[in-house]
Amino acid sequence: MGRSLKKGPFIADSLIKKVEKQNSDDDKSVIKTWSRASTILPMMIGHTIAVHNGKTHVPVFITEQMVGHKLGEFAPTRTYRGHMKDKKGGR
């Protein structure tokens, strides 16, 4: 189930302030955030937001198709190295 329309989308207050400040200054520098649960809004289009994946910040360039999704969807937290070929070989 999605979030109630009455409540509106969740977005961290600090992230909103940073995006609005950059929009008013016409600044396009990278914004660092730890808020993976924040919803992408139309005002973020064209910005690069570095989303924390648990280890590093992954830069995500926001496009129109991403609006409505969460920031965490675009910064994978797990790495897949493949299954071992055989017991003797290793990786």
Swiss-Prot record:
GO terms for biological process: ribosomal small subunit assembly; translation. Pfam families: Ribosomal_S19. It comes from Prochlorococcus marinus (strain SARG / CCMP1375 / SS120). One of its GO terms (cellular component) is cytoplasm. It comes from the Bacteria. Keywords: Ribonucleoprotein, Ribosomal protein, RNA-binding, rRNA-binding. SUPFAM superfamilies: Ribosomal protein S19. Protein S19 forms a complex with S13 that binds strongly to the 16S ribosomal RNA. The gene is rpsS. One of its GO terms (molecular function) is structural constituent of ribosome. Belongs to the universal ribosomal protein uS19 family. This is Small ribosomal subunit protein uS19.
